[in-house]
Amino acid sequence: MRLTTRQTYYLVTSLNWFGAVLPMAVMILLAQSRGVGLAEIGLFMGLYSIVVAVLELPSGALADKMGRKRAYIIGGLLNVLARVVFLLAFDLTAFLAFAVVLGASRALTSGALEAWFIDALQAEDPATDLQPELAAAGSYQLVGLALGTLAGGALPTLFSFLPAEGVLTPLAVPLVASIGAQLVVAALAGVLIREERPSAVAGAADEQGDLRLAEVFSHVGQAVSAVVKSSRLRLLLLVDVVIGAILAGSENLWQPFFATLLPGADVAAGGGTLALGVVLGGSFGVGILGNFVATQLSRALGKRHALVSAIFQVAQGAAFVFLALSGRFLLATALFWLTYLTRSGWSSPHSSLFHREVTTDKRTVMLSAQSLAGFAGAFVGSVALGALAEATSIGTSWIVAGAAVAASALPYLILDAQDRRARPAKDPEATGASPDLATGAGRV
């Protein structure tokens, strides 16, 4: 039985995220147990962001030329290698090596499957509304994220009999499980994803399908030119920079923050890790609710996706500030979940706005440009917020992050005003589609 486009995308991406986040609830704690401080963690995670940023556009252009499926599988295998390096890392140099390999992996995989999914949907129905499709896909991915973090949080407790020092410790078990899971996902992608040869899609490859370096860099140049010419893309990418920064501040700092709220738990020996898994798993679980709220709110507001995005950004900023000021485990957990709910709600309307501005032939490279913006922000967030947390407190870093994300609602208000001026009240496209969506005019 052949799976549909939606079924294939939902299955592969949800399993991918399940395997990827198995160690996420304890990964920072594992690095700390091997003598790495918060500032050093910010440094190697910042390097990861730099590597992704440098490779994003070339790798996205390469994926458009060589095929999204092939790029995704190669990136998945590099991801496995990166996790092996982390498993064996005991000093900053090794963690920096991990960051380089992981960055190369992320650059290859980012946007590859999403581009395949969007193009396949639009081939079936060019007028399809992408927001509910992306929200549904996001919900399936969040199920994988939630289950993966819960399982990863439970594994150290189940293997608490292992020594607290060495390669295979309780905190390292989720990483080992993740390596196996990612290998399975790469194999599934190879079997389930069906893609036309890039030459058939682009009509630009030579008879043997060989890639020419000049073509790749020409594709990159077109993407850069598109961003320079489009004020709407620049505003959307600016928000991606901010989200990248605050997400880095959240992911790098939440484990030590919540570990201090678990008095008496020997985390290095596996104590309290299930609670951390519940914290992170629950955050992804409420993200499903965020997708539902985004879809309902978009409908209620006439598919004004820019306005919906602005509302979620302000709410997310407030959640970060209150989280920073909280001091009790249950209250902090609820507020942490709220940051994920609002960020999940923001994602699909933001992505819908972005995809309106992009044409099929450059979709992967433009998604790479979007990812580049996010990781450029992540570099700043990792280094700056990590250093600020070590010099002051994690709470101070999160207050700064909250103020920044709330301020990022302004670009959406500008976009919403442009949309309302550009479309007559009775124009059916005023409910959310780009004014030039039907013809492709004005898209990049």
Model-derived segments and spans:
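C-terminal transmembrane bundle of multi-pass solute transporters/carriers
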Residues: 1, 14, 42-46, 53, ...
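Glycine-rich segments within core transmembrane alpha-helices of 12-TM secondary carriers
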Residues: 134-156, 373-381
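C-terminal ends and interior cores of transmembrane alpha-helices
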Residues: 77-91, 95, 314-327
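Juxtamembrane intracellular "pre-TM" segments in multi-pass secondary transporters
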Residues: 1-3, 193-238, 430, 435-443
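Hydrophobic core of transmembrane alpha-helices in multi-pass small-molecule transporters
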Residues: 14, 82, 93-109, 330-345
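Helix-loop junctions on the cytosolic side of multi-pass membrane transporters
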Residues: 171, 178-207, 413-427
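Helix-loop boundary and gating motifs at the non-cytosolic
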Residues: 1-54, 87, 92, 232-280
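Cytoplasmic helix-loop-helix junction between adjacent transmembrane helices
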Residues: 100-142
